[in-house]
């Protein structure tokens, strides 16, 4: 019947209600079905579209809560049909989860998060974060005001803290980027600490370059790591340094002028 709908009316639109007449003309029986108003909402303008979207949002949230997901304020949570949530996930207010995102049990999301195509492993915490195409490992801690871009992987127990942006970067288990840093095109080993205001300088104006930082490294605050670069295991960089050459394992690199008073 749907393929026989015409537009010969004053609005020039296809009317779904015309299906009843078409079915009867084809010899089919037509009977009444009792349903809710929500199931037969019409969408003719943006206001009605928003109402239909809100009804679907509420239905999806109800289904997940019945499956064991905790939502502190479900009226502020938006979850795509394509999202996978385990039981025992906790979602705080003002959270949007979309695309192929997967949230594993024990994870805490929110408040104020937007996650798209993001995997959050068991018992991880994500606060006030925008994440696109990232993988957040078990027990990892993200936020607040963190931006995870495609290709970002956080290992188990890793931390990406306040005002941190990461792109195409692999942060090893128990490594930390606590605050105010940009990490782009990088691989970082386990147990490494990236000091505040560190920048991975990955772009030379034409191409992006990779930085490799080993395990148990200490990057001093306000360090500029100019890629391509390799920093060995257990190395240190002094605060305020501009590092342009590889740093051997266990070494201390200082790339700044001496203070003069």
List each language-model region with its residue ranges.
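Phosphate-binding active sites in nucleotide-utilizing proteins
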Residues: 77-118, 122-123, 129
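Long, charged amphipathic helices and adjacent flexible linkers at domain junctions
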Residues: 53-82
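Glycine-rich hexapeptide-repeat left-handed beta-helix
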Residues: 117-261
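Short coil/turn connectors at secondary-structure junctions
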Residues: 26-28, 37, 86, 189, ...
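Catalytic-core segments of class I nucleotidyltransferases/pyrophosphorylases
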Residues: 1-57
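Residue-level recognition of oxygen-bearing side chains
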Residues: 15, 48, 84, 230, ...
């Amino acid at each position: 019947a749907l393929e026989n709908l015409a537009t010969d009316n004053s609005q020039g639109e296809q009317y779904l209600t015309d299906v009843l007449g078409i079915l009867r003309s084809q010899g089919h029986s037509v009977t009444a079905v009792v349903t809710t108003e929500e199931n037969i909402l019409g969408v003719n303008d943006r206001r009605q579209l928003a109402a239909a979207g809100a009804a679907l949002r509420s239905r999806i949230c109800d289904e997940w809560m019945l499956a064991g997901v905790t939502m502190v304020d479900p009226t502020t949570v938006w979850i795509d049909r394509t999202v996978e949530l385990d039981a025992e996930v906790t979602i705080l207010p003002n959270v949007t989860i979309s695309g192929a995102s997967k949230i594993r049990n024990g994870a805490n999301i929110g408040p104020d998060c937007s996650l798209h195509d993001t995997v959050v492993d068991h018992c991880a915490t994500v606060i006030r974060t925008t994440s696109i195409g990232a993988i957040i490992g078990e027990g990892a801690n993200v936020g607040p005001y963190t931006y995870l871009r495609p290709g970002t992987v956080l290992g188990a127990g890793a931390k990406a803290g306040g005002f941190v942006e990461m792109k195409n970067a692999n942060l090893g288990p128990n490594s930390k980027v606590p605050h105010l840093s940009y990490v782009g095109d990088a691989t970082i080993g386990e147990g490494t600490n990236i000091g505040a205001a560190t920048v991975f300088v990955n772009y030379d104006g034409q191409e992006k370059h990779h930085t490799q930082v080993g395990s148990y490294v200490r990057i001093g605050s306000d360090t500029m790591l100019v890629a391509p670069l390799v920093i060995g295991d257990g190395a240190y960089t002094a605060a305020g340094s501009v590092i342009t050459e590889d740093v051997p394992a266990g070494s201390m690199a200082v790339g700044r002028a001496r203070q003069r008073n």
